A protein has these predicted regions:
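Acidic (Asp/Glu)-rich catalytic clusters
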Residues: 2-6, 36-43, 101-105, 133, ...
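Aromatic- and acid-rich polysaccharide-binding/catalytic face
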Residues: 97-120, 166-169
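Substrate-binding cleft of secreted/luminal carbohydrate-active enzymes
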Residues: 139-176
């Protein structure tokens, strides 16, 4: 899935130049729909965060720029919800840049991934406020990946209320 490990071009798949690539995308969405439907039938809601960190370009879904990415995000949304009838998803968007925002109707929660450096426990207020600016509507904002956990006192002081945070792995989890 890393850009430097594949020759797949999302732009070509989405604009019709790579019909096999487009079909591969549909097949992948259809395969995951089976699993999501099983969770739906079991009454399990899913925080669904597909195609994360797109604006970074290090994953294939972000390597072709915002337009093909947004097309893919919307394709996935409609394929899962309209075609397959999946209705247990809470859509968590994590494109990290307003140019990549697919639109309010496709997003329930806006997520930010932040790795500020070793032993940086700030509230990340600037990134929180940036995430708020992606839309004119009210959206929940989450810290969907992080290194150090923000200091609760700094969160309170700055009035920054991330809905949740998800400390990714490694030293941030294992060391005190």
């Amino acid at each position: 899935f890393y850009t430097d490990s594949t020759k797949f071009s999302l732009k070509k798949a989405m604009n019709g130049e790579d019909k096999a690539g487009y079909q591969m995308l549909l097949d992948g969405i259809d395969a995951i729909a089976v699993e999501l439907k099983a969770m739906q039938e079991a009454g399990v809601p899913v925080l669904w965060r597909p195609l994360h960190e797109a604006s970074g370009g290090w994953f294939w879904w972000g390597a072709s720029g915002p337009e093909p990415y947004i097309e893919l995000y919307k394709l996935m949304y409609h394929r899962l919800t309209d075609y397959h009838g999946v209705n247990n998803l809470i859509w968590v968007w994590n494109g990290q840049d307003a140019a990549w925002y697919p639109g309010d109707e496709y997003v329930d929660i806006i997520g930010e991934d932040i790795y500020p450096g070793e032993k940086v426990y700030t509230s990340q207020a600037a990134r929180f406020l940036k995430a708020l600016s992606y839309t004119d509507t009210r959206k929940i904002i989450a810290l969907t990946e992080n290194g150090c956990i923000p200091d609760p006192e700094l969160l309170k002081r700055d009035n920054i209320m991330w809905a949740w945070w998800c400390t990714w792995e490694g030293e941030f989890v294992l060391k005190s």
